[in-house]
Amino acid sequence: MESDPVDNITLELIKTHSEINIKNIGKTINDLSFNSEKILVCGRAENQHPAFSPRFSSPSTKINSDLYVTVDHHPPKKEYFTRSGKYALSLITHPDISKKIIELGGEIFWFSPQYLKNDLPKITAGVLGLENSGLAAISLASYFDAKSILLSGIKLTGSYAKFLEGKKLVFENALKNKTKIFSLDGVLAEKTTFNDW
């Protein structure tokens, strides 16, 4: 039986995945730089996204991006991991994800959830056990000092509504970093158009 991709991760899996992954750390997100005041963050709740660079997305969004971001603790689905490129991976991701990215010729840049004790850069992607790749991408955009983030296809509705508590943390951290967040649909943030952004 296949797992629901938005299932909670257990504390045991967090420990197991992070212990395996930390042995394979090469580069971290501190080895990346995006010198842009604006970053577009895309999710799979929409099929069409504006052409803009830099653009961050989860692999499941199935678009070309400057940075693919995932916190997924399930084995990699072959239909989602099809592109080489730069990937920001949470320490809690399933260890087979990094293997798949290397097979594709991609580059991996690691980060850690805020609640694990280690020397990796910390990114908030939600609350313990309920983390979301879209929220991680928003946090990363703010981490890279974007002054303005535009969301496309990130809604956190339906089965994803359980990530709304984590959204509060991510948005609070972005505000502390003086990052403004806008949305094309107005679901999670102030609505704007791509041209007005």
Feature map (PLM): residue ranges:
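Metal-ion/cofactor- or nucleotide/acyl-coenzyme-handling active-site neighborhoods
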Residues: 1-197
